[in-house]
Amino acid sequence: ISACLVGSEMCIRDRNSAVDGGNMLLHSFECLLTIDQDGKIAPGQAETWEVSEDGLTWTFHLRDGLKWSDGSDLTADDFVYSWKRVCDPVVAAPYAETVLGMVKGFDEAQAGDLDALAVSAPDAKTLVVELSNPCPYFESLAAFATLSPVQQATVEANGDAWATAAETYISNGPFYITEWVPGSHITMSKNPNYWNADAIKLGSIKFVLMEDSNAAYTAYQSGDVLFIKDVPTQEIPSLQGNPEFHVEPNLGTYYLSMNLEDPAFADVNVRKALSLAIDRDYVANTLMQGTYSPAYNLVGEGWVDTDGSSFNANANGGQSYISDDFDANLEEAKQLLADAGYPNGEGLPTITYTTNDAGYHKTVAEYLQQAWGELGINVEVNIVEWSSFTPMRRNGEYMVARNGWVGDYSDPSNMLDLFCTGNGNNDGKFSNADFDAAMEKAASTMDTAERSAALHQAEDVLMEQVGCIPVAYYNDFWLQSEKITGIWHSAYGYWYFMYGDIAE
């Protein structure tokens, strides 16, 4: 299969610290657990697992005969090393607290005492994890890419460079990288040492790297690639009804990050004004041609509350200051801006909006320029390449930036944790004591009703303080040749090619 999934040249990643590139890398690495075709947790490197009655001890039993792609044995000790490495302050993994913050000894490990992390291997096939508080979704974390194993000998022999070349990129998944041509493609070949290699029909997968969705579309039309993830927006109307065009929801929100260390956004009224001036229905249904849904809270459809119901349906209306009347919202925005000392936008610095040029991002940027212009605010649009965009945003080199998050698991904490003080993915540097306290409560209580209330309280605080500006809820839309069989898409924004095939 030849597929175009990403535009970044920075695609080979250190599994323990990666943030993007997951669509490719899930084919070369496998965690203890994985996600099956129905979106359910399934055995991966671990064949079975159990949790103690108090919810504090998780035990995973590995399969017999696990191997690395170089043919060497893979044992529970490899997971111990890798999970402790995630906590290493030198590695500085952005997801560390998200995936291991509930494990006993995490804080000490983050401070440099890696052996304090309560992860152990009593034998070569058993991994024991002790939690400081129950985590009902921990099995989802055990399927999350950051907790993939990495080969200790290779990492220690090559340092950070281990993850930058195909020959040192030793992995344990159904495929392994055999060729990487920066800016062109990454080729993965079937891993004969994978535990389920007999079920893998494809000999190789070629991931083509293209920054331009129009070029990808041309390649698809010519048959050079059989799958493209980023469909040019102008082509969508003509593709409606085409059996090769697919649209499915995912657990994601398209939102705006404001650099809250910038004095321009110090007043919550300014932040509310920017939010109120956005016509979300117009953005989702007109600009995005109905491929997204309007977002009025951070946590969208599909996220599961503690009782199994929809978290979004139970939302308390954190953005209750936004009415159904957009004209009224616009007038309120103007008043809030005046209350903040910027009547008609006077005195407010020019806002630079930074985004990458893919999908609807440029279209949304131009809309924001016009919408905020209605408030008298001057907006400049800064378009940067994807490979530069994420580091710029993470380093705070922006005023307002496009952002987005697709769930790694269906618990709402996965979305809300982003905004905890000090979180590695908190690009806007939102910091609020009430929010942090609510999230701490959600992480520590064993009562499901209390946990639900705490999570909703956290979202309410985030929305009322406008720690970010939700704009739309994601759907994934893609083109897939009818020649491709056996692949599937998950609500987490991933495509699974490993058990696919090409029909003759």
What are these model-derived regions, one by one?
Residues 1-12, 188:
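Short, small-residue-biased leader/transition segments that mark boundaries at the very start
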Residues 478-504:
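Long beta-strand-rich cores associated with HINT superfamily self-processing modules
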Residues 37-40, 114, 124-125, 131-200, ...:
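Gly/Pro-rich hinge or "lid" segments in bacterial periplasmic/extracellular proteins
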Residues 8-9, 13-53, 170-171:
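N-terminal lobe/hinge region of extracytoplasmic solute-binding protein
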Residues 321, 325-327, 378-389, 414-481, ...:
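Extracytoplasmic/peripheral linker and loop segments enriched in polar/acidic and small residues
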Residues 293-339, 358-362:
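Structural transition elements
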Residues 61, 78-80, 91-153:
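Surface-exposed binding/hinge segments that line
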Residues 192-237, 378:
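Ligand-site clamp/hinge motif
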